[in-house]
Amino acid sequence: MWKSVQKRDRIIWKSGNPYEAGTDKTFSLDTLPQEYTAYGNGDYRINGLETEQADGSDTANLKYESYEISKGKYSLKGLPEMFAKEDEAETLEIVLKDHASGLRAHLLYGVFPQLDVITRAVRLENTGTAPVTVKKAMSMEMDYEYRELDAVHFYGKHNMERQMERTHLGHGLWKTETFLRLRK
């Protein structure tokens, strides 16, 4: 058993650690489940956010700034979404900030208790003085340690996404995405 602990410890030590972890070898962003990550901080898994700052740097170090719980569900103007009356849902908004660039990521969670549904979205806000180019922004990411899980999603053509599909989540990456081609 000691050999496996030593081996695991060496692996974690080689992974990138945030400055705040100091010499703590048991902490690594590369092995911990995280809510929403940005490129370039020692987590070598697929990140939800990739940006480029005006100076060419491509790292965003998102840190917790605040949260707010409000009645009703958040709105996504111009995008498809679930709707609810104010008394049918609540919104949890968690704000993460990259202090170097001023970029804020607003993580939005729509909670529908009667339906057993949680919706997710991300809104980005540049509060800095320089432009930030967004290369990739996913509405969510989930890290799970080894469990027996299924993903349930709906697919179909435009305004007809009603075909339910259940997929077993095995080792590795699983994603669902939509490809939309805009015409002029």
What do these predicted regions represent?
Residues 1-184:
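Polysaccharide-binding surfaces and accessory modules of carbohydrate-active proteins
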